[in-house]
Each structure stands twice: as C-alpha cells, then as structure tokens.
C-alpha cells in the first residue's frame, strides 16, 4: 500500500515535469510572481487579479516556485496558470478564470475549493493541453453529467494531460462519455475518487495514453479487452478496485515500466511474457486471487524488473527458483502465498541487489534461518512476521546493511541476542508478539545504538525498563511485565516522540517531561500521584492516555498549552475536580474520557449556553458525581459530531510519528478507548475518525434531555443511563440515523416511546428499563426485537416483547397526540445557536413558531 502511494506521488511529479517542459518556445517564459503581473496585457493582468480576489489567498505561499503565471510572448495573453495550496473559496461558474481563452496549461492543485461541483465552463477553455485539479475535495460531477457527455471536457480536444485525482467524484463512467473523445490524451489520472462502474472498452480509443491511473475507485467487472490498444502506455495503475476475471491482456503493452493491479479480484496465472518486457521495472500484483506457478523465461536474466510484489495470492509450485532469474530485483514481496511446503531462503542467493524482502505468513525452512545459510548481503529490510519461527533467525547476523527487521507474531522464546545490537545500520526493530523475556548481555548496550524505533509489545519482559538509545524516536512495550518506576532517563531522549508503556506494572509517579512527547500512553499500570502540571507553551502533545492507574489531584491546567491535543483519557483513576470547561479552548480535541473518577458539579457552562468542544467526537464522563441539568442548546456547537458518518473523510485516528524520508517503513500510533456499547464493556483498539459516542451514565444529572441532541447525526452510541433525567424522550432522536446503541435505563423518563425510534435502521440495542414510560412499545420495528429486560420496570408499558398486552390491541395507541403536544419541543437548535447570546428567549420563541408551522422547510434551508 505504501508503495502505491509513493508511485502515485511519482506520477504527480512526472506530471509537473511535463508541465515544465511542454511550453512552446514562442511563449514568454519569465515567470510572473503571484503577487503581481508585469509582462501580460493590462486587461489580462486585471482579469488575473480579479480571479485572485474571488478567493481567500491569505495562506498562499508566494515563494512557492510552482505558483505563477506565464504569458504568450507575442499576444500577452495568459497561457499558463499554476496555483497550488493557495485558494480558499467557491469556484463559481462566472469566475474570471473562464475568460482566459488562450490558456494552454492550468494547474489548480491542493486548493480549498468549497464548491461541491466542477463548473461546466471549463469546457470553454478549448485550447487547454493540460488540466490538473487533483486534491481539491470536489464531490459532485452531477452538473457535469458524468454518466453522459461530461461537459467538463466536451470541447477540450487538444487536452494532453487531465488530472482529477484525489477528489470525491462519484457515479458511473458511461461508454458515451466525451472523455473518450480526447484522442490527444497522454496522461489521465482519476485515482482516489468514488467512481463505480465497469471499465468502458472505449478506454482503448485513447491510444496515445502513456500514463493511466484509475486506482482507488470502485471499478468492477473484467478489465476492458481493448487495453491491448494502448501500445504507448508506460505506466498503468489499477490498484484498489473490484476488477475480476483473468489476468488483463497486456501482452502488447511492451513499453510498460510500471504495472499496478494490486487489491483487485483477478484470477488465473501470471503470464510469463511480463518478464520479457524490456522496460518493466515495477510489477505489483498483491492481494488478488492469482494461482498456479511462476514461469520466468531464461531470457529474463536481462530483465530490468526491480520491484515485484506478489503477496496475498495463491501461488503454487516452486516459487523462488524462477524468481532467482530476475537478478536485478531490489524489492520482493511474497507474503501470505499459502504455500504447502517450507520455503528455502538460500534460493535468493543470486539476487545480489535485493534490499527488501517480505516473506510474512509463509512457512520457512528452519535450516535456511541458521547462520550458515545465505541471503543477499545487500539486504536492508526484512519482514518475517507470522512465519512460525521458534528461534531467533541467526541468518541476520551477517547483514551489515540491515536497517529494518520485523519478526513479529512468531514463537521465539528466550533472550534477544546481543549481536543484534552490533549491526551498524539497524534503526527499526519490531519483535512484538513473541515470548522474549530479556536481553543477552547488559541492557546498557542500547544507549549508543542508532535504533530509532523499538517495538517490544506482547512479550514476557519483566523487571526494570532498559535504558533507551539516545537516538530513539518511538518506543512501545505494551503488554509486558515491566516493574519499578518509569526511568527519568526518558526525559533526556530529545528525539523521543512516542512512548507507549501501557499494560505493565509500573509504579510511582509520572515523569515531569510528558510535554516533550507527541504520544504518551501509560494506561493500565499502577502509577500514583498527580498528573504533572508541566505542559509548556506550544507543546506538540497530541495524545495522552493515563487511564486505569491510581492518580489523584486535579487535571493540570497547563494542558491548555497543548493546542495540538486530540485525545485525552484519564478514566478509572481518583482525580477529583470540577468539569474542565477550560478544555474547550483546545481546537483539535476529539476524544475526552473522564470515566470513573471523582469529578463533581455541573457540566453545563456557567452561562447556561452551548458546551464548547467543536471537534469533540467521543465524550465519556460516566461514573462520576456530576449534577445539574443540561440547557436546551447544550449540543449545538458540536460541529464534528453533527457530521454524517465518514463525512470528515478519515478512517481511523492514526498518527504517523516517524516521517523521515529514508524510512523503509512508516510507524503509526493508534488510540485505544473503553466504551459501554450495546450493553457491553468493550475495548476499541482502533477508533474510527467518524465514530461519535456520548456516555453520561452513572451520574446525578437531571431535567430534560435536550432536543439539540438530534443535531449529532454521527452518533453511534449514546448512554444516558442511571441518572435522574425526567420528561419525555426527545423526538429528535429520530434524526440520529447512524445510532446503533441507545441506553436510557434507570432514569425517570415519562410519556411514550416515540415511533421515530423505530425508523433507526442501524439501532441494534436499546434499553429504557426502569423509567416511568407508558403506552405501547412501537410494533413492527427493530425495537420489538429487543430482549424483555430492555423495557422492564415501566409499569405503564405494554406490547411485545413484554408479556403485558395493551388494553385494546386492535386499536393502535394514540401517540400522535403526544407528539403533537411535543412538537413545540422539536426546535432546530442550529437556528437557536445563531442568535443565542443576546436574545435566547426571543430566538427560542421564533424557532418554536417556525418549527411548528413548517419544519420541513426550515430543515431544508438550514441543511439538516
């Protein structure tokens, strides 16, 4: 996957090189600064300045060598316009951009266009030869008729380069699309979008293509047979789609230098002719359903193939013998091939240039791992995870160029050999998930090493923590039995960014240097004392987890200096403090967990307005002593939780903490959190960025549940149980379309269960037990599929799954009356927020009036 990204970055780099060299010699090539035009005609200069004024350019980097304007030497007309990371605002259909009719090359990459769709007026720029709009966040091509003529490119017959990658385009690609009329195209990139359709055979009409990238979309079905027409193509990227069928017919594409088909569903065998292509240097076929043996012709010894990834397939027969003929290989991935016999690494000896090897998930011959065996001395990175290895592979002892070793998830016991630390280039060591219990020789051997990443997770280490290398960047020792105090020497490791010592037996206080790091996890130890109040201004701290210890005192106010903080968990300690309203000043805080401490007092702001925390996604304050009621507008400002699922575009809360350009791998840190979910206590080892959860259970909160909770469309789990909430269940719960778990048990709620809860199609768990609810449980919905105990303790409830039948089951309960009475409570709290400060009462009255008469209209206008 990482190689795919690198390849696509290279692809973009080639595009930019093309942009630099395609300008005809008749052009005036003196680049005009973005800040002012001195060589173009006055009218063109004015038009450009007008175009700039349509956007916010405060963050534009005027020193960026990419940004600029070129003008024709004879006419003075703008012919080349390049602006990246510069423009913020809406690209409108009447933009002055579309008045530059002489434009040949237009690159507006990585800007912040807030417009959802691409204006069709691009088609008026009919002299364009290059159009690059990658990474702009466009999400809609409906106004450009993606399924039809695609007006964006209808008249752009001279276009040679088109890059619309890394946006959010969706829909299907119709064979009649005018895209396929661009017969001059040499470079086409639609990668990283959401286009879902079969691959039209008319791609074969674009027979001048040299680079084609359709990766990371939803293309399905068989690869178009006319691909054999693309005889000029040098780079073909079809990664991460859902393409099926036998291997594509690419035997005519003899100019290929890069062929990427990974993460699809291709089946059959790998054709041997690939290894005869004279220019092929990269072949990526990972994660398909390919089978059979590999046949490499003897003539392939002159092959230029340097990178070959075949992992996660079903290859059979002798694998390494034919591969050993590809003597120019530098990177080889044969992971998880499901072979039925042990693989002998000695067969790699002809590959003298091999620097990267991944054999994970395969059975290796024990003899081939001994010190008497041979693998290329050029090896820099070796991955042998899940290979059933029982002894430390001594074959590594001779690899003086080794930088990265990964032997995770094997069955290796005993101590780590001392010779490992004598390898002069060793920087990345991951030996997690084995049974190591110590280190040969003195643990002080670490100190002067060049090791930057050291991962010791899930082993049997015990005793004091070893002294870490001075060069260490990331250190993780999760799930071991280390004891004693956390050594103060870690405070002297000035490069240390990530330290994870969770799930050990450390005692004593937390070191004072927490703000030196970016990621700190001390969860589930036996630490005591208070959290150090030593976070300095502009601290880079992003994640702090000290849950499940014996910490006391108050939350340190110096956390306010950590403007990058995204994750804060102090759950299951003995912290005694009031609710930290002051944390709302942290602009990036996504997760706040205060569960099971001694926090007390109200959680409503002193002015009784909305709670802050605009980016908050997960808010856990269960099992404390919080009191008071929640004002109606309590949830209005929770903008992140108001997003729909995945609307923020992320996947997991994953942070990269080693970004060195020469790193053979990228190490990341993921947050862990405990949740009460679907009535169960669950530990989430990876937290989705789109996940939103609230847990107020086990406190002393009272009053009505605010209707504004219905704004939090991203909510997946909501737990308000074991409080003293009164009043009716909010009708706005019906807006929580992603809700999966809802617990309101153990309160004093009255009235009926709203029918709207039955429309929540993802709701798999609900409990309203032990309240004062009455009436019939909504029938014919997922609610009736719940267990009986979810509704017990409500004397007035009847209907399935309870045994109590309603008075007259033939007549449905009259719930609309209550809902009509409560409709005045269904207020659009976004409107309340707009006019909240000076005129709360007036705003509530107006919102009440509007919502009562035309709620659908109001919702449409505001966008919920």
From Swiss-Prot:
What keywords are assigned to this protein?
Cell membrane, Glycoprotein, Leucine-rich repeat, Membrane, Receptor, Repeat, Signal, Transmembrane, Transmembrane helix
What residue ranges are annotated as transmembrane?
Answer: 831-851
Name the Pfam families for this protein: LRR_1, LRR_8
Record's superkingdom? Eukaryota
Sites carrying sugar chains: 61, 73, 94, 112, 176, 194, 229, 252, 298, 338, 433, 448, 492, 505, 561, 719
Q: Which residues lie on this side of the membrane: Cytoplasmic?
A: 852-864
Q: What stretches of residues are LRR repeats? A: 100-125, 127-148, 156-182, 183-205, 207-229, 230-253, 254-277, 279-303, 305-326, 327-350, 351-376, 378-398, 399-423, 425-448, 449-472, 473-492, 493-514, 515-538, 539-562, 564-585, 586-610, 613-637, 688-712, 713-735, 736-760, 762-785
Q: Which residues form each disulfide bond in the chain?
A: none
Q: What membrane topology does this protein have?
A: Single-pass type I membrane protein
Q: Mind telling me which GO cellular component terms the entry cites?
A: plasma membrane
Name the family the entry cites.
Belongs to the RLP family.
What is the name listed in the Swiss-Prot or TrEMBL entry for this protein?
A: Receptor like protein 24
Say which species the protein is native to.
Arabidopsis thaliana
- Gene transcribed to yield this protein: RLP24
